[in-house]
């Protein structure tokens, strides 16, 4: 195992120790480090971010990680590819059921789930806070969507964000059969 793989394994272990939301939390953390919105991190940003998580890298290690996930020769790591590598490996059955659940939510088929998509498959009408007048139905839908959304809370959930959410949960479910049954029941697939 080379340096970059060892670092990913350490980060993955930290995420799994945090439970089902660990990968999603780390994804949010790294996306916040991307201050310029380039969807990439340079070695300095990576070192700084990992240090905040208690994982110290020297310059050579940070460069190694950046080189591994540098998709365009810019010297920076592609954030989405790096986060994809951090997700615990999932079987094809798990990936397929997550994709099916996402597709059910993505009513418009444009690759993102929005409030408009949710209105067709999820009703907030009977939510206790709607019934008391505290929230509107749209507020319920937005808060539901925020569970899966990245830290920007842009009101859109991509398949990658949906996978981030479920990858941590997947790691805590022993068998594919249990995971598929859970997802099928939750999303009425």
From Swiss-Prot:
Phosphorylated in vitro by CaM-kinase II and CAPK. SUPFAM superfamilies: EF-hand. Residues 21-56, 57-92, 93-128, 136-172 form the EF-hand domain. Keywords: Calcium, Cytoplasm, Metal-binding, Phosphoprotein, Repeat. Ca(2+) 1 binds at residues 34, 36, 38, 40, 45. The keyword Transcription does not apply. Ca(2+) 3 binds at residues 106, 108, 110, 117. The keyword Nucleotide-binding does not apply. Ca(2+) 2 binds at residues 70, 72, 74, 76, 81. Gene3D superfamilies: EF-hand (1.10.238.10). It comes from the Eukaryota. The modification Phosphoserine is found at residues 38, 40, 74. Monomer. Does not form oligomers in the presence of calcium. Calcium-binding protein. May play a role in cellular signaling events (Potential). This is Calcyphosin. It comes from Oryctolagus cuniculus. The lineage of its organism: Eukaryota, Metazoa, Chordata, Craniata, Vertebrata.
């Amino acid at each position: 195992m080379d340096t970059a793989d060892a670092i990913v394994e350490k980060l993955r272990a930290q995420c799994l120790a945090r439970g089902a939301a660990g990968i999603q939390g780390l994804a949010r953390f790294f996306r916040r480090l991307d201050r310029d919105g380039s969807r990439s991190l340079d070695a300095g940003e990576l070192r700084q971010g990992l240090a905040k998580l208690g994982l110290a890298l020297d310059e050579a290690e940070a460069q190694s990680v950046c080189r591994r996930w540098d998709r365009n020769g810019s010297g920076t790591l592609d954030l989405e590819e790096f986060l994809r590598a951090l997700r615990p490996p999932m079987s094809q059955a798990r990936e397929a059921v997550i994709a099916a659940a996402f597709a059910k939510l993505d009513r418009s088929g444009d690759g993102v789930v929005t409030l408009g998509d949710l209105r067709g498959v999820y009703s907030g009408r009977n939510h206790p806070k709607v019934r008391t007048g505290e929230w509107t139905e749209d507020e319920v839908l937005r808060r539901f969507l925020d569970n899966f959304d990245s830290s920007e809370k842009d009101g859109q959930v991509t398949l990658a964000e949906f996978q981030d959410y479920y990858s941590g949960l997947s790691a805590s479910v022993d068998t594919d059969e249990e995971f598929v049954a859970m997802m099928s029941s939750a999303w009425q697939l």
